[in-house]
C-alpha cells in the first residue's frame, strides 16, 4: 500500500515522499493524522529526474519510496479520533449520495484505519476547470479529517471519453496531447493538495494507463466482461439519455463504465483504496465499481462510493462557465486576477451557498457573514470578496492571491494605486486590448479614442457614460467630453487604460 505525505515539483524533477511498507492500520493512522508526534519517523526522498522528458503515463509507477519507523506496541494500539467527514460534507451541501451508511460510521470509528479515497480526472484538457474543483475540495476534506487523498489520472480512460452528462462523443486526442494534458493536470493536483494544510498531509497520484496498457481484449472480457450484465449497463442514466438522443452512443462510450469499474477494483485490490468519490453524474459509474468488487472479490460492504452535487447557480444553470468559456484552474490558461474576478462577481443569492461548498471557512463564520448581509451597515460585496480570496488562495496559493488583489486594486476606477506598464501588460491578457499608432492617439479626443478602441459602440454612448460619472482613463474620472489625450496620459509612453464603469475596460497599446 503506497502512502504519500507530499509531492512537489522541482524544476524538471519530482520529489515524492511515500511508502510501500508493512505497518499496522493503527500505526498508519497515527502517522497520517498526527505526523508531528512521530518524531522517530523519517522519510527518504527519491528524485525522479526529467519529469517532462519521460512518459508521464508511467511516471508514478516508477517512483519507489520508503518510510522507516521505530514504533512501539503502545503507539500501535493508540486509538485516533477523526472528525466525521461525511457529516461535514452533508452540513456544507457537499453530499448527494453514499452507497452505504457504513461509510459514515467508518469515517469516525477510531478502530478503523484511515480511508483511502480517490477521485478520477480524465485528461481531456491541459488544465482542470471549476467543475473539477469540487472533487479536489472533497478530497481535501477527507485529507483534513485524517484520511488519504488519491488522485487518479485517466491516461487510459481519457482515450475513450466518459459519456456521463455529455450529448456528443468526445473528440479523440492524440498521444502527444494526452501526455501534455496528463502533465498539466498532475501539476495542478500536486500544487493544491500539497500546498494546503491537513492533519494527515497525505496524498498520492496514480495513472490508470499503468494497468490498462498491457491488458488485451481477451483479458478484459475474461476479467471484467463476464461479470457485467448488459441490462444493468443499459439501465444507467448516462446510457439511457444518449441512446434516446439522435447522436446515439458508440460501443467505446458504452464500455466506459466497465473501465471505470475495473479501475476501482484494481485500486481496491492492489492499493487498499476503498472509497471512490465523484459528481452526481458519476453515480452509475461508481456503483458499477462497487458491484464489480462485490462480485469478483466477494467483498460485501468493503468498498464505498460517495457523490457530491454538481455546482449550480440559483437559476439551475451550471456554475463554472464564463462568456469566454471554462474557468480554468491553471494560471497559464486563466490568470489568478481573472479567476478572482469570477468569484467576486457571484450574485448575493449564490454567495453564501458557495462559501459553504467552495471554502473551508467554519459554518459559524459563514453565518456571521450571512447575517451581516441583511443589516443596514453591510458593505456591498464583503461576502464576495471573502469567497474570491478563499478560493483563489486554495487554488493559486498566497502569491496568486496577492497578484489577483494587486491587479484588482490597480484596475478599480478611482483607485489611488499608480499604474505602471508592467502591471498593465499583465492584466492586458485578461481584458480587451488594441494597438494604435502614437499619431492616432496623441491629441485625439477621449470620446473618439474610446470608440476607436472598442469601449463604446458610439460617441453618444461614451458621452452618456461620461455625464453619469462612469468614464475613467488610467483610473481617473473624465469629466470633460472635450478632453484630448496628451503625452502625460500615456503610461511610460506605451499605453493607457480606459474604463466604462467598474467592469468594462480596454487597454490601448501605443504601437
From Swiss-Prot:
What's its catalytic activity? tRNA(Tyr) + L-tyrosine + ATP = L-tyrosyl-tRNA(Tyr) + AMP + diphosphate + H(+)
| Origin: domain of life | Eukaryota
Summarizing the function annotation, the protein's role is: Catalyzes the attachment of tyrosine to tRNA(Tyr) in a two-step reaction: tyrosine is first activated by ATP to form Tyr-AMP and then transferred to the acceptor end of tRNA(Tyr).
UniProt name for this protein: Tyrosine--tRNA ligase, chloroplastic/mitochondrial
Q: Could you state one GO cellular component term attached to this entry?
A: chloroplast
Instruction: Indicate which residues form the motif 'HIGH' region.
Output: 123-132
Q: Which organism is it from?
A: Arabidopsis thaliana
**Consequence of gene loss (knockout):** Embryo defective. Developmental arrest of the embryo at the preglobular stage.
